[in-house]
Amino acid sequence: MRLVVDGFGKYLGIENGLIVVKEKGKALRKVRPEDLKQVLIIGKAAISSDAIKLLLKNRVDVVFLDFNGEILGRLSHPLIGTAKTRREQYLAYGDKRGVHLAKEFIKAKMANQMAILTNLAKARKDSNPEVAESLLKAKKEIDACLNELDGVEAEMIDKVRERLLGIEGKASKHYWDAISLVIPEEYRFNGRRGIEIGSPRYAKDIVNAMLNYGYSILLAECVKAVELAGLDPYAGFLHVDVSGRSSLAIDLMENFRQQVVDRVVLRLISYRQIKPEDCEKRNMVCQLSDNARRLLLASLLERLDSKTQYRGRNLAYSSIILLHARDVVAFLRGERRYEGFVQKW
């Protein structure tokens, strides 16, 4: 279970061994700590030190976010795993394992982009054949990028990172140019902005604000998975090391952007559940209204906890993310080959 504590005046404490959310002294909700897997503290909500201790004792992930979805920090149980895992992670940066992982992360992202475009095209085959044709054309362009990616080989990631990112960037441009065709004009979406930064504070329109908020929530889930698997979240392969940036978690996240975030955002827009007027412009930057932000967050968490068939099992997306973090560990330790997460629907 995930617990969201959102808004000024909300307070999370403990009472008779239970986690309790209060507002103006009145208990709004009580939860057993052992039933929780994550707590999200948003904006100016507060938490007591006793609650923090109880949550950490029960290995509950605690994430602090601002109102824009920016991750301010995390509290988690002391790291698990073995020193061998991290040694292999650092060594892989200088050999072919790092190249293989980077390529698999990008391959999965491109394959999932093509799956999204295929589904969107099928839905418009009769109602808007011209747009459907454009979507399928973009899919073919991404497929060509996949073929180009297959030809990239090197002894270490530093020798091919720029080339890999160039191919990934080209594929993403085809993807977002196509996605813009299915988003109503009133949303004023002209493609991704601030991709490199990936921060909600750089969004100029409501679609980018929604995407960036969603990717922040997904990143928090990936950081948790990477740490639970015993990996160093800051030592990535595809994304370079930057102080304070969880590069490996961002690498892992490439597997899940489309299936966890993009689908949710496109659905909310398609049903007009979040509208252009839910964008509040401040200093030329779009900030989601409180109602839109809460609806988006609830939809994202529901998606993370929803189940799908994967490897013959009915698994939540959050469980699949953890499974893939552990797959990375198994690959680094020479136990089996790593393959990215791809879902055809």
Swiss-Prot record:
<keyword id="KW-0460">Magnesium</keyword>
<keyword id="KW-0378">Hydrolase</keyword>
<comment type="similarity">
    <text>Belongs to the CRISPR-associated endonuclease Cas1 family.</text>
</comment>
<comment type="function">
    <text>CRISPR (clustered regularly interspaced short palindromic repeat), is an adaptive immune system that provides protection against mobile genetic elements (viruses, transposable elements and conjugative plasmids). CRISPR clusters contain sequences complementary to antecedent mobile elements and target invading nucleic acids. CRISPR clusters are transcribed and processed into CRISPR RNA (crRNA). Involved in the integration of spacer DNA into the CRISPR cassette. Acts as a dsDNA and ssRNA nuclease, binds to linear and circular dsDNA and linear ssRNA and ssDNA.</text>
</comment>
<keyword id="KW-0540">Nuclease</keyword>
<keyword id="KW-0255">Endonuclease</keyword>
<dbReference type="Pfam" id="PF01867">
    <property type="entry name" value="Cas_Cas1"/>
</dbReference>
<dbReference type="GO" id="GO:0003677">
    <property type="term" value="F:DNA binding"/>
</dbReference>
<keyword id="KW-0238">DNA-binding</keyword>
<feature type="binding site">
    <location>
        <position position="254"/>
    </location>
    <ligand>
        <name>a divalent metal cation</name>
    </ligand>
</feature>
<dbReference type="GO" id="GO:0004519">
    <property type="term" value="F:endonuclease activity"/>
</dbReference>
<keyword id="KW-0694">RNA-binding</keyword>
<feature type="binding site">
    <location>
        <position position="168"/>
    </location>
    <ligand>
        <name>a divalent metal cation</name>
    </ligand>
</feature>
<dbReference type="GO" id="GO:0003723">
    <property type="term" value="F:RNA binding"/>
</dbReference>
<dbReference type="GO" id="GO:0051607">
    <property type="term" value="P:defense response to virus"/>
</dbReference>
<keyword id="KW-0051">Antiviral defense</keyword>
<dbReference type="InterPro" id="IPR050646">
    <property type="entry name" value="Cas1"/>
</dbReference>
<keyword id="KW-0479">Metal-binding</keyword>
<dbReference type="GO" id="GO:0046872">
    <property type="term" value="F:metal ion binding"/>
</dbReference>
<feature type="binding site">
    <location>
        <position position="239"/>
    </location>
    <ligand>
        <name>a divalent metal cation</name>
    </ligand>
</feature>
<dbReference type="InterPro" id="IPR042211">
    <property type="entry name" value="CRISPR-assoc_Cas1_N"/>
</dbReference>
<keyword id="KW-0464">Manganese</keyword>
<dbReference type="GO" id="GO:0043571">
    <property type="term" value="P:maintenance of CRISPR repeat elements"/>
</dbReference>
<dbReference type="InterPro" id="IPR002729">
    <property type="entry name" value="CRISPR-assoc_Cas1"/>
</dbReference>
<dbReference type="InterPro" id="IPR042206">
    <property type="entry name" value="CRISPR-assoc_Cas1_C"/>
</dbReference>
<protein>
    <recommendedName>
        <fullName>CRISPR-associated endonuclease Cas1 1</fullName>
        <ecNumber>3.1.-.-</ecNumber>
    </recommendedName>
</protein>
<comment type="subunit">
    <text>Forms a heterotetramer with a Cas2 homodimer. Homodimer.</text>
</comment>
